[in-house]
Amino acid sequence: MSFRGLNASSGMGVADHSKNTFLELKRKKVHRYVIFKIDEKKKEVVVEKTGGPAESFDEFAAALPENDCRYAVYDFDFVTSENCQKSKIFFIAWSPDSSRIRAKMLYATSKERFRRELDGVHYEIQATDPTEMDLEVLRERAH
């Protein structure tokens, strides 16, 4: 598939399953995280992996590919200084330096449209290596 076939302003479509899985994370808390990938044959963003509510941040980070781009949402639970339990949803655009330039371009041009489909995301992080999205970064952004 060439880039000429893509509308750069709209990017890829979004599979209904992707939207529904995000809503399950947001409303029902059945997932700790969801990792999405672009299916170039279907020309849409699809769910690649979900993590159960008991899965850790380390398990989430390990599930992201080392050399390829992905989108992810992570439901971050924390306790405020007032001792209140809170939860914030992070959208993470994972684009490691070692990924192919074509993949980086594809994910970059599709990000905004996909992100708009995910109503209820509190924060967005663009990460090129794990240190840009570690737990400390999430804590700082959430407080």
UniProtKB/Swiss-Prot annotation:
One Gene Ontology MF term: actin binding
Q: Which GO terms describe its biological process?
A: actin filament depolymerization
Q: Name one GO cellular component term.
A: actin cytoskeleton
Which keywords fit this entry according to its UniProt record? Actin-binding
Domain of life the protein comes from: Eukaryota
Query: Which pairs are disulfide-linked?
Result: none
Q: Where is the ADF-H domain?
A: 11-143
What does the UniProt function comment say about this protein?
A: Actin-depolymerizing protein. Severs actin filaments (F-actin) and binds to actin monomers.
**Record family assignment:** Belongs to the actin-binding proteins ADF family.
Q: What is this protein called?
A: Actin-depolymerizing factor
